[in-house]
Swiss-Prot record:
The lineage of its organism: Bacteria, Bacillati, Bacillota, Bacilli, Bacillales. The keyword Transferase does not apply. GO terms for biological process: regulation of DNA-templated transcription initiation. GO terms for molecular function: carbohydrate binding; cis-regulatory region sequence-specific DNA binding. The gene is cggR. Homotetramer. Binds primarily as a dimer to each half-site of the full-length operator, with much higher affinity for the right site. Then, both dimers interact, bridging the two-half sites of the operator region. Gene3D superfamilies: 3.40.50.1360, Winged helix-like DNA-binding domain superfamily/Winged helix DNA-binding domain (1.10.10.10). It comes from Bacillus subtilis (strain 168). Belongs to the SorC transcriptional regulatory family. Beta-D-fructose 1,6-bisphosphate binds at residues 149-152, 175, 185, 250-251, 269, 310. This is Central glycolytic genes regulator.
Length: 340
């Protein structure tokens, strides 16, 4: 397959470019359907005139339906996208990129989607879709899925669909509130993901950023203890990775802690822990829920983070062995490997 692709790149470069463009159009329609032509044109940076011709071709091939409320994929369109995905990974060089990134960061596996979510917001949705597919491959008969907060994990929740195998799915927040907006908190995302998956959920009703005394007291509350035991029995953890300073500011972190994070050169954050460039913990938010030591016992851990601006944060987090599947985008992967 690789030899054929290399030959096509030399003999028929235009063919692969057309194929890539049409694949991206189908991919974007799948993520946002129903969508109007003007919105699609603006999102993909393709002129309406060119897009009109491409959409007409896809309609003639029975891959796209055009209705008054916008464009949607046909059943054939969905099937073709599914068949093409592995081929397009080879065409775009993502298969090799995944292998290189997996070895570079010592990952359980690497899944890379095309594009850069810093430049194209729809790429975050595609990461969400890839993360959902990854989760479903790893579900067993009975599952407890712990999820963190953040905009990227919210994208995973938004792309979640019911499990066709009707497996038992219980979703729980990995941690209590960490100071984010309500819509980005683990509780909110946990409930959203469970509803989209037709699963069930348990919530953790505790305030974020507790003092040591309050933390010690609240974890002894029977209702909190029960949910904590469920969280610590998780069979899967889905979490994001953020830039340390960005996350600290977003959470209205106290000035004293901000100084500590800055003085200790924190570059990355995950579920309330701040790490330096060597992957060492330099600050921890006192919040109820899953702790760093707990993740070693979790069979499946999926980290979802992308955008070229997060390359340094992703690399720092994986400086320590994590036994994790990373779902990221081309922008982050290429910058990370280019900077090595």
């Amino acid at each position: 397959m690789n030899q054929l692709i290399q030959a096509q790149k030399k003999l028929l470069p235009d063919l692969l470019l057309v194929m890539q463009k049409r694949f991206e159009i189908l991919q974007y329609i799948r993520l946002t359907e129903p969508i109007g032509r003007r919105s699609l044109s603006a999102s993909l940076g393709i002129s309406e005139r060119v897009l009109r011709g491409e959409v007409q071709f896809l309609k003639e091939q029975n891959l796209v339906d055009i209705k008054t409320n916008g464009m949607t994929l046909t059943e054939e369109g969905y099937e073709l996208l599914s068949v093409l995905e592995d081929t397009m990974k080879d065409v775009l060089g993502l298969t090799l990129l995944e292998k290189t990134l997996k070895e570079r960061l010592n990952l359980k596996d690497a899944i890379i989607v095309s594009g850069d979510s810093d430049q194209s917001p729809w790429v975050k949705k595609e990461m969400g879709r890839a993360a959902v597919a990854c989760m479903k491959k790893r579900f067993s008969g009975k599952n407890i899925v712990a999820v963190t907060g953040g905009t990227t994990i919210e994208a995973v929740a938004e792309m979640m669909t019911p499990d066709s195998k009707n497996r038992e799915l219980l979703f729980v927040p990995a941690r209590g509130g960490l100071g984010e907006d309500v819509k980005n908190q683990a509780n909110t995302i946990c409930a959203h993901m469970a509803e989209k998956a037709s699963g069930t959920y348990r919530l953790l009703f505790v305030p974020g950023q507790l003092s040591q005394g309050a933390y010690s007291s609240i974890i002894e509350e029977p209702s909190v203890k029960e949910v904590l035991n469920t969280i610590k029995s998780a069979s899967m953890l889905v979490h994001g990775i953020g830039e340390a300073k960005t996350m600290a500011q977003r959470r209205n972190t106290p000035l004293e802690d901000l100084k500590k994070i800055d003085d200790n050169d924190a570059v990355t954050e995950a579920f309330g822990y701040y790490f330096n460039a060597d992957g060492e913990v330099v600050h921890k938010v006192h919040s109820v829920g899953m702790q760093l030591d707990d993740i070693d016992a979790i069979p499946d851990i999926i980290a979802v983070a992308g955008g070229s601006s997060k390359a340094e944060a992703i690399e720092a987090y994986f400086k320590k062995p994590r036994n994790t599947v990373l779902v990221t985008d081309e922008g982050a992967a290429k910058k990370l490997l280019r900077d090595e």
